[in-house]
């Protein structure tokens, strides 16, 4: 395995501090991994420009790579194109559902810009019912909303698409 492949593999173990069931790879925020003069360069895009977890993510990336013998890690942030939930891996979406968080639906399915946008039903991650109600636009983090399933009665987070 070459060094860049090794780095990608190491990044699989770096958890998102706000949704620890996901790695930074699952989340889809790692855009590029390269070596410049033998030193790792990681290019990432935050889930949104004011994401409070970015400093902790950078620290976790550096620590993980340092533990595997990589030093002088450069981490570059790229804001364009902006991250979308479509960049999240299918494995990551499955992990969210297993953890009890409804994964984001594809952008074209649920996120309609404009004045007359219609809210789509979000399936319950526990019983798969679409008979759900949004309780709050904002959950424990800015990227989640709180829903309740009207069939099983359970509240759940929905990872909002953007």
Label for each model-derived stretch:
Residues 1-162:
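Domain-level signature for proteins that mediate thiol-based redox and metal-cofactor handling
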């Amino acid at each position: 395995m070459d060094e860049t492949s090794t780095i990608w593999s190491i990044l699989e173990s770096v958890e998102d501090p706000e949704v620890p069931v996901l790695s930074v790879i699952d989340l889809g925020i790692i855009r590029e991994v390269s070596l410049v003069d033998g030193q790792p360069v990681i290019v990432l895009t935050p889930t949104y420009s004011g994401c409070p977890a970015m400093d902790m993510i950078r620290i976790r990336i550096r620590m993980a790579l340092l533990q595997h013998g990589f030093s002088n890690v450069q981490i570059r942030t790229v804001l364009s194109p902006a991250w979308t939930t479509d960049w999240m891996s299918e494995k990551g979406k499955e992990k969210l559902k297993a953890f009890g968080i409804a994964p984001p639906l594809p952008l074209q399915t649920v996120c309609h810009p404009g004045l007359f946008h219609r809210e789509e039903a979000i399936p319950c991650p526990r019983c798969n019912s679409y008979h759900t109600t949004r309780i709050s636009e904002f959950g424990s983090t800015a990227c989640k909303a709180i829903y309740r399933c009207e069939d099983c009665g359970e509240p759940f987070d929905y990872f909002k698409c953007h």
